């Protein structure tokens, strides 16, 4: 008969063997899962991995449906924005002719009348001309057939070579020569052949809004005070609380035998007052907003950049700064020369005939090749 010691030792051996096998089996399972995970990652990265992929690329992929929606909606809303610009501009012109000019004719001296007539009509002509040309002029497209023109890179959307300073517009779905941006207010891209028209429209529209805001300031104050006084008298005649030295309640319950006093202003006068207030508020708001946009584009023109190139050059400047190198914009010809190239000015008299008067002259160059200063480095903005 076996002793109890032998039974205990047998049980202990079984426990030790079980504890010895369990880690091995668990380790074998974990190793199998790890192998499957590594194999899946190898397959996934072999199909989708790109060394250029970063967080910006991932965010672009995530927001691609939103970009698609914005691009397609902007294309359709461009017509609405163009109609809105035409309607607002026409309303200002009508108010000036019907409300402002009669006041000027009746109260201003002759030389001021001549000044307002000459400057106002010249500014209106420049605004209408440049807006029409900016909306109807094609920005410029690279040739589709094979040419000997040097190209910088390949468009990822069109899969065709594109020259320097050419970029793809996702709204127009085409490559644009010297693309600046897509303007929904023009329903058109701003590129090489209509960039001057766009900036001139912004400049003269800002000047026109500033002119209307300054000229109609006194008329606006008088109209606003008249509207407020009309509200005061109307509220008083109806027994409403009116502002004054405290809140005074005027009641005519005990004066039923008296007739309602006539209104302080006729319907036509009230419409004139409201029109003048609308004119001043609209032109002042547009002058501030559009003036800031015009100033920003003027800074870009002074630097010899477009809106797209500004972001590209900023990234290149940071990248080269980390390497201890200096980035220079290869299309920067100096401040004055940048403006001459932009406006297409070749001689001194061109500043009058091509800038201060309506002109349909084409820009300098064909938008395919560009002259770069002698000091340019090997780094170019693409």
Swiss-Prot record:
Main location: endoplasmic reticulum
Name by which UniProt lists this protein: Palmitoyltransferase ZDHHC16B
Main function: Palmitoyl acyltransferase that mediates palmitoylation of proteins and is required during embryonic heart development. Involved in the proliferation of neural stem cells by regulating the FGF/ERK pathway.
One CC-aspect GO term: endoplasmic reticulum membrane
Enzyme Commission number(s) from the entry: 2.3.1.225
Any one GO BP annotation for this protein: fibroblast growth factor receptor signaling pathway involved in forebrain neuron fate commitment
Subcellular location field: Endoplasmic reticulum membrane
Originating species: Danio rerio
PANTHER family found in the cross-reference section: PALMITOYLTRANSFERASE ZDHHC16
GO molecular function term, any single one: palmitoyltransferase activity
């Amino acid at each position: 008969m076996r002793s109890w010691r032998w039974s205990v030792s047998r049980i202990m051996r079984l426990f030790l063997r079980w504890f010895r096998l369990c880690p091995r089996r668990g380790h074998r399972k974990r190793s199998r899962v790890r192998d499957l995970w590594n194999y899946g990652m190898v397959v996934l990265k072999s199909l989708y991995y790109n060394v250029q992929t970063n967080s910006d690329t991932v965010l672009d992929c995530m927001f691609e449906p939103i970009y698609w929606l914005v691009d397609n909606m902007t294309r359709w809303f461009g017509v609405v924005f163009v109609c809105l610009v035409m309607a607002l501009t026409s309303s200002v012109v009508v108010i000036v002719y019907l409300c402002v000019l009669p006041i000027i004719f009746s109260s201003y001296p002759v030389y001021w009348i001549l000044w307002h007539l000459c400057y106002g009509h010249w500014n209106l002509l420049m605004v209408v001309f440049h807006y029409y040309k900016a909306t109807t002029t094609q920005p410029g497209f690279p040739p589709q057939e094979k040419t000997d023109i040097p190209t910088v890179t390949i468009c990822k959307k069109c899969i065709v070579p594109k020259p320097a300073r050419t970029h793809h517009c996702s709204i127009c779905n085409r490559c644009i020569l010297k693309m600046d941006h897509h303007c929904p207010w023009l329903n058109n891209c701003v590129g090489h052949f209509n960039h001057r028209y766009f900036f001139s429209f912004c400049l003269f529209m800002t000047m026109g809004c500033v002119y209307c805001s300054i000229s109609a300031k006194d008329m606006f104050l008088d109209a606003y005070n008249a509207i407020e006084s009309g509200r005061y008298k109307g509220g008083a005649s109806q027994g409403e609380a009116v502002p004054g030295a405290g809140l005074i309640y005027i009641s005519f319950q005990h004066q039923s035998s008296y007739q309602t006093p006539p209104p302080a202003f006729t319907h036509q006068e009230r419409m004139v007052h409201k029109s003048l207030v609308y004119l001043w508020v609209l032109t002042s708001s547009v002058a501030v907003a559009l003036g800031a946009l015009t100033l920003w584009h003027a800074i870009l023109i002074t630097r010899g950049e477009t809106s797209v190139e500004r972001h590209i050059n900023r990234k290149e400047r940071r990248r080269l700064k980390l390497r201890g190198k200096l980035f220079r914009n290869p299309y920067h010809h100096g401040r004055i020369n940048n403006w001459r190239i932009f406006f297409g000015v070749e001689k001194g008299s061109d500043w009058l005939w091509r800038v201060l008067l309506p002109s349909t002259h084409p820009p300098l160059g064909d938008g395919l090749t560009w002259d770069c200063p002698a000091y340019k480095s090997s780094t170019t903005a693409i």
